[in-house]
Amino acid sequence: MPPLSLVEQAQQLRDLARQFEALHARVRDVSYTPGTDALRRISPLLLKVQDLMATALVRLGALDGSEYADIAGSRASLECLASVVAASSLAGNDLASALYANPYEGAPFAGYPADNQAVRTARHAEAIPRMTGHLADAAHQLDLSAIGCHYVATGITRDLAAAQEQTKPVQRTTGPTTAPSASRTPRVRR
């Protein structure tokens, strides 16, 4: 297996950050009506965040198992990428919670009366603020995920540059030489 290209990993993390940013915008701007419409519009967002979280987890495993882990300063980047995995997972949880708060229109158990329009309206009115809160929390976590990916990409680039700087051979420079007679005054005999 060829060695991991850290420059390529940094670029892939920048791409992942852009995907988190795009999903953040989609979650922030999602428009829905409680019920089936909300399920139809929020479900793809949940699936996408799970995909991005899995990608972040794969990147974390690749970097942790590479020569990058031996470079000074890499721990901060690895921990930051682990926080991206956590934040994106929390975003998925928030989207799932929005779906859980969604008022579904299924039939009640046998023997219970079906909801009338006033009850449905009240259920929707209760659900909307909860769903909106969960969606706002998901958007926040996605924003943190994007920022984390940018930080890690920058950290990799910085750590590589520092490591290359340390491996350069040291060139000694010599200062100007002074002639011994020019720097001393002659002795006076008595």
Please tell me what each predicted stretch does.
Residues M1-R18, I147-R190:
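Terminal, compositionally biased segments
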